[in-house]
């Protein structure tokens, strides 16, 4: 993500609000007064945002107005007139973030540049416009990244905002080496406070995750800042939204059902709390569809390690935030008043198990590398391999029902000579059964078995390794990893060192093929056959 998040993409695009309910109100432009400020319209948060934006535009330049930009709908202006653009800080689906310096004051800021050519349709344009409106609307709140200005030229939109030089939340937790429940409660208190502010100001974030919370500086007391409002929306009481947006682990069940409101943000924070305390997400799987199926089931594990060592108050809050019924879920205000989260509350000041930190580090640092490698492997599968899996499905589906039961799967895999333990087959079944109906249809089977197959095939792993090993030296260096992740749109400057360190078992500063294979197979069922609950805990996604 870098110093300033660069925006996420929608998993599935749909109508913003339920037909028959009001959509997020279009902003009403303020009427400019003589001094260039704008009169605020009292009707909506969007109007306030638009008025602030209009005022900024009116006062930003005294030169003749340029042509009107199609995204921000105001005169285009060159950002480099005011700022010097420096090194790259991060990269996302729609944009790149650079360090920038205000030419007059020397202040260091972050400039998020969004290429207009990547805004493929009106919805994408509306998203960027709304992001600017929302950030202006939330401007001045102490724990939200401050937008200093928005600029549009012929090719790009530039958002200039506070520079959060302290890095991501995960990085701070890991760097400290240990933390207590009380520290986790303080962290959650800050996050929920931010969301309470957003909700009270008529904004749903819709993409809450640890990566979207940054620290303003490297100081121990640096304030936490929420960022990346690219998926956020204005909302009114009772308004229902239907488009599926967000990041897989953190999406609320009602979002997947296309009928949700601000309660979805509380679910996402509940997932974050679970990760802060246990080091792994509560709902995991080998594919996005399987993650969604687990979320819809809503069964959270509060029995396996390290949960027996965690206080009853923490577990009570997790349950109430991850209540599958949004109407019964706590509000942000209620979370802030829970005994565990209060400043002088019940959270014990006892260090959490070190394994939690290790898991946090794995989940944070290895995610993008493994994701990139899996993408490469999936792309190198031949038609012949896919055809073989189709035939395998037919052979396992003995009653020709078009679906496979657990018993059919066990018998069929054994006859195919595939060496999986019962625990591994049950894991495969659960991961493959995306709709949670207890059986696997053809599409579910192919998706799941392609993954298990490719993890067990040396040639696929080697193909992926070669993709990263750009100079064919037999090693993946830091520079090669950076290049490959940039090509995949997964680059994060902050995590490269952690990725190398975690995979580099012989500590020579680079990753050889055996280390790459070990990293890829860790937690996949190929490296070790263990208790399924333990395997779940050690899985690196």
UniProtKB/Swiss-Prot annotation:
Binding positions for ATP per the UniProt entry: 89-97, 112
Highest rank taxon of the organism: Eukaryota
Annotated Low complexity bias: 38-67
Binding residue positions for Ca(2+) 3: 469, 471, 473, 475, 480
GO biological process, one term: intracellular signal transduction
Active site: residue positions: 207
Function statement: May play a role in signal transduction pathways that involve calcium as a second messenger.
Protein name in the entry: Calcium-dependent protein kinase 26
